[in-house]
Amino acid sequence: MLREIRRVFMHYEAGSYDVIVVGAGHAGCEAALAAARMGASTLVITLNLDMIAFMPCNPSIGGPAKGIVVREIDALGGEMGKNIDKTHIQMRMLNTGKGPAVRALRAQADKFLYQQEMKKTLENQENLTLLQGKVEKLIVEDGVCKGVITHTGARYYAKAVVITTGTFLRGEIIIGDIKYSSGPNNQQPSIKLSEHLEELGFELVRFKTGTPPRVNSHTIDYSKTEIQPGDDVPRAFSYETKQYITDQLPCWLTYTTEETHRIIDENLHLSPMYSGMIKGTGPRYCPSIEDKIVRFHDKPRHQIFLEPEGRHTQEVYVQGLSTSLPEHIQRQMLATIPGLEKAQLMRAGYAIEYDAIVPTQLWPTLETKVVQRLYTAGQINGTSGYEEAAGQGLIAGINAACKALGKEELILSRSEAYIGVLIDDLVTKGTNEPYRLLTSRAEYRLLLRHDNADLRLTEIGYKIGLISQERYEKFVAKKEAIEAEKKRLKSYIIKPTPQVQQLIRDVGGSELKDGIRAADLLKRPEMTYEHIQMIAPAEQPIDPEVAEQVEIQIKYEGYIEKSLQQVEKLKKMENKKIPEDIDYDAITGLATEARQKLKQVRPLSIAQASRISGVNPADISILLVYLEQGKIARVSNE
C-alpha cells in the first residue's frame, strides 16, 4: 500500500504532444511517421530503441496480398516500401505466370540494416521525438484518452494515442516444457498495460505465434539444396525508388524427410501445442511443423527454405520449421534434413503467447469504441504479419493526427485497397485466430493490383499531406500518359500487311482478315504491348510503368468494368448510413443473433452491416425499412 502511495507522488508532468505512439515495431513506425509528416507533434515511446522495426520472425517483406499492401503503404506516403528497397538482399516477383490480380513482390531483408535505416528515418523526421520507456497506464478522463504514464512515473499528454504493442502484451515464450514471461526474442514484455486495458473494459483474447530455429550458415551443406536466386530484372516496392540493389544473395530450398516426421510424431507429447501448455490460438496459414505433420500425415515431405538474415551475419532462418518442441528435439529434427545434417543451432525455435484485443471493439478508423481518442494497430488487433501491421499503423497514425488537428478521418473501402479489406474484416467480422491477409479475402482483387496502387491511393495521400507536390505532379503526368496512349491505341488502325501477319503467326495467333484497332489486337491473349509497339509504334518512348498500365487496362477492360459496376452497387449501400445512436432493441423482427452482433459492431452503413457474420439478408431488409420509416417520421415532424 505504501509503495503504491509513493508511486502516485512520484508521477511528474513530462510534456504534451498532439499524438503519442506506444511501440516502434512496423505498425508504430508507420503511425509515428504519418502523424509527424502531417504536422502533428509526435512522441514515440518504445521499450528498446535498439529494436525499432525489428523482425522477430521471417526476415522478409511482401508476398501474396502482403506485397500489395506494401505498395499501398507507399502510394499513401508510408515508409515500409522505401526502407525495404534500400535494405533487401533479394527480390522476386511472385506468380508471374498468373494474372495481374495475384502478382506480388517479395523481398528478403537484411533485418539488421532494415532496423538501422528505419531508426535513422525516425530520428531525422521533423515533429517526431523518440523515447525509450515502458507505458504502463493510459490517462483516461470521462472516457477520453488524454495521455500515458510510464514506469518511471512520467505523464505525457496528447490529443490522441496509438497503441502498437505487437506480441509484447503479457508475452510468454514457450520451448518444450519451459515457459517464461518475455516479449519476442527474449525482450522484456509489457504486463501492466495489458492489465490496465482490461480495467478500462477492453475484452482481450490470447493468441499464439511461433518462429523456427536459426542455424549457422558455415555449417550448412548447400550442395544438397536447391538454389533460389532473386530476379535479374530490377524490382522495387516504392514508386519513388530509382536506385536498385543488384548484388543479391540467394535463398536455398530443401525438404523434411520421413525421418524428420518420425521424430516429430514420436515426440508430439512434448510439444506445448499438444500437451496443453499453450492455450492461445495459433495462425492457420502459418502452422508449426508439428501441426503440418499432424494435419497432413500422408505428405512425405514439406518444403524448407533457408533464408539468410543479413549480409553481415551467419544466421540462417529455417523457414517452414516453426516449432516449440524442446531444444534437443529441434537438434534431432535439423539433422534429418538434407543440407542441415551438421548444422549448428544458433537460436532455438519458440512459440510466443500474447494478449490481443477483440477487434470488433474498433471503429473503421481504428479508434477504439471503449475509449475515445485511443487507436490501436498491428498484432494487438489480432493480425499476423509485418505488412498487415504497417498498413494498420499508417491508417491509425493518419487518423490520430486528423483527430488531433481537427481534420476529417480516413476510412479506406474494400474496393480501394487491401488495407481497407483488412480493417473492414477486423472491425466487422472480428477474428478468432491471428488474421492473415489473403487475395481470396478481397472480392475486388482485380481492382486491387500490385501495379495500380498509386492510381488508387496517391490522390488520397496527397490530400492528407503525405505525398509531396513534386511526386504528385509526376503521378498526374503518368495518369495523363496512360490515358493518352490508351486513346491512341483505340484509334490506331492496324492493317493486315505481310509484316503484321508474320508477327501474328510468330506468336501463334490467327491472321487478320481486315484492319483492326490496335487496342482490340492487344486484347488477344498471345499479344503483348511490345508486339503492338513493333507494328504501331508511339512517336515518343513510353515509360515502362505507363506501358504496363496500358496493357493491363486494355486486356482486362471487360473484367475491370464488371468489377467497377459491382463497386457502384456497393457504394449505394455504403451511402446508406446508420445513425450512431440507433437503438437495435427498438427494431422488431430482427433475429436475436443479428441484434446482438449489430449492437456489438455498431456498423456505420448498411453495407458494413451486411458483412457481419450472423446478420442475414432478412435482417438487413428489416433494418432498411426501419431506417426509411425513421426518415419519413423526421420529415413529418419537420
From Swiss-Prot:
Disulfide bonds: none annotated. It comes from the Bacteria. InterPro entries: FAD/NAD-bd_sf, GIDA_C_N, MnmG, MnmG-rel, MnmG-rel_CS, MnmG_C, MnmG_C_subdom, MnmG_C_subdom_sf. This is tRNA uridine 5-carboxymethylaminomethyl modification enzyme MnmG. Keywords: Cytoplasm, FAD, Flavoprotein, NAD, tRNA processing. It is found in: Cytoplasm. NAD(+) binds at residues 282-296. The lineage of its organism: Bacteria, Bacillati, Bacillota, Bacilli, Bacillales.
